[in-house]
């Protein structure tokens, strides 16, 4: 079936067997969606966020976290409305496809693809740091640890949706229990003034340690707050993955908004507690945490000593594992949706004949993320790569996320303006102003991210990926499109109700 003249795209007829080989199973309710959203993010409360102390000090980190929370509130309320109105696995790509056409949908999906392929790679570097610290493995063997963890958690996601969601629920609850245990443990061991405020500014403008504390809340001023925004993103990054579970949700129009909003409320409370307590523990401090790959473990060690370091390390690993597991889930669905519609090679969207999970998409996505890690590792050398790979990958993931957020917020605004006829079971209380705030904060965050010296190293890989996939879509993909649920909805201008295949 050809498109009208001038569109430059062609839809190919497929038979019922095409969608039969790409079937998904409905399982998730509100609780499962909540666990999926919180689990995807929770690793950011265990590692990554703390690098912001080096650019903003404690007060800069707190205020940056608040600004980023506003951005995510605007985003999550927007996608809560869109996911109920367009309950398709495509999520960001689906929203942008309906609002901005095929190329808009493709580029939005590509931005989100960078986020979900690279974020597991970031998390596994933190996991490896914890494992090396606990077991005493020489960091030179880190690639082996990466491969082992990817293999285990891709397999868990492949062998059944119900198993995947049950694992997600269990490790998310354990992760939150670990954080609550740490909060309760930390409160009697706090010295906020001496340790949280122990960062000053040296002659070269870099952070220096104040042994007696008592420093400024904002040692780098307001510019330090803005420079800390990319690190604060790690406190909430990936909550937006929930709409990718739309076709595996029992009632996405009702449950998806509830799951997203409950997840965001949980994360805001946890983020505030960890930013307040982790650097305030006696013997830790903001300065030490500003370069730590295992901040929560540092806090637990300071409270309980080294005698139980193995047990404490295993406990501290849970949050990282929760996010690693759930983002591999999201990665598979994101690749699956673009492939099912023909934007990516269509073979990637075939689901497992028994378990009905997008196993090909998850395996290929994991292989790409792992390949990027190995290329960086061997091109830089083990010693240099060990100290920079986490930051390089984090910049790649955050840049992809920011572009995706801008596109999703723009899609929300356009759909509010141009598609008033679409049924909206849920409406964002923040409306268009919330979406505008998301765009503004995301643009500012990108602007300050560019100043990170590791940004250029990471963004070059992102540009290469964009060039390769844009060439594929321009030359091949757009001539092999399929009327998937996302495409059918967009083609009809939102008039065709969603139909499950």
What are these regions (language model features)?
Residues 391, 396, 400-401, 430-501:
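A generic transmembrane alpha-helix motif of multi-pass inner-membrane proteins
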Residues 142-202, 237, 260-265, 398-407, ...:
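Membrane-interface loop-to-helix entry segments
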Residues 94, 101, 132-137, 201-215, ...:
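TM-loop-TM module centered on a large, flexible mid-protein loop between adjacent transmembrane helices
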Residues 46-141, 263-269, 273, 458-467:
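Extracellular loop-to-transmembrane helix junctions
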Residues 23, 348-359, 402-454, 487:
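C-terminal membrane-solvent junction of multi-pass transporters and transport-like membrane proteins
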């Amino acid at each position: 079936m050809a498109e009208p003249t001038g569109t430059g795209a062609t839809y190919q007829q497929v038979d019922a067997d095409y969608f039969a080989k790409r079937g998904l199973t409905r399982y998730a309710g509100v609780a499962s969606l909540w666990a999926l959203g919180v689990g995807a993010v929770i690793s950011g409360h265990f590692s990554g966020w703390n690098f912001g102390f080096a650019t903003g000090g404690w007060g800069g980190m707190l205020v940056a976290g608040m600004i980023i929370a506003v951005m995510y509130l605007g985003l999550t309320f927007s996608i809560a409305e869109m996911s109920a109105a367009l309950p398709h696995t495509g999520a960001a790509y689906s929203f942008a496809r309906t609002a901005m056409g095929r190329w808009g949908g493709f580029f939005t999906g590509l931005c989100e693809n960078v986020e979900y392929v690279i974020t597991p790679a970031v998390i596994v570097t933190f996991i490896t740091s914890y494992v090396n610290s606990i077991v005493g493995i020489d960091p030179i063997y880190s690639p082996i640890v990466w491969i082992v963890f990817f293999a285990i958690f891709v397999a868990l996601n492949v062998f059944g949706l119900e198993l995947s969601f049950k694992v997600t629920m269990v490790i998310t609850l354990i992760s939150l229990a670990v954080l609550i245990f740490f909060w309760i443990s930390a409160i009697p061991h706090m010295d906020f003034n001496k340790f949280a405020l122990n960062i000053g500014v040296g002659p070269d403008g870099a952070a220096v340690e104040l042994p007696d504390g008592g420093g400024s809340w904002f040692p780098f001023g307001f510019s330090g707050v803005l420079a800390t925004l990319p690190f604060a993103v790690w406190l909430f990054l990936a909550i937006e993955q929930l709409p990718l579970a739309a076709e595996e949700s029992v009632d996405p129009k009702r449950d998806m908004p509830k799951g997203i909003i409950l997840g965001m409320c949980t994360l805001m409370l946890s983020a505030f507690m960890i930013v307040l307590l982790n650097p305030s523990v006696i013997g830790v401090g903001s300065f030490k945490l500003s370069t730590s790959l295992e901040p929560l473990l540092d806090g637990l060690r300071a409270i309980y000593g080294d005698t139980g370091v193995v047990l404490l390390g295993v406990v501290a690993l849970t949050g990282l594992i929760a996010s690693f597991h759930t983002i591999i889930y999201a990665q598979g669905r994101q690749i699956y949706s673009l492939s099912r519609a023909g934007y990516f090679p269509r073979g990637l969207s075939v689901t497992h004949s028994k378990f009905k999970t997008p196993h090909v998409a998850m395996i290929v996505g994991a292989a790409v993320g792992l390949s990027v890690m190995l290329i960086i590792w061997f091109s830089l050398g083990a010693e240099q790569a060990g100290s920079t790979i986490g930051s390089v990958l984090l910049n790649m993931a955050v840049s992809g996320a920011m572009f995706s957020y801008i596109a999703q917020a723009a899609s929300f605004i356009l759909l509010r303006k141009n598609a008033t006829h679409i049924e909206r079971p849920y409406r964002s209380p923040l409306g268009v102003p919330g979406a505008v705030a998301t765009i503004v904060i995301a643009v500012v965050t990108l602007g300050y991210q560019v100043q990170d010296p590791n940004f250029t190293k990471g963004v070059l890989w992102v540009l290469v990926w964009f060039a390769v996939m844009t060439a594929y879509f321009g030359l091949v993909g757009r001539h092999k499109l399929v009327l998937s649920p996302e495409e059918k909805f967009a083609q009809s201008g939102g008039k065709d109700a969603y139909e499950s295949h």
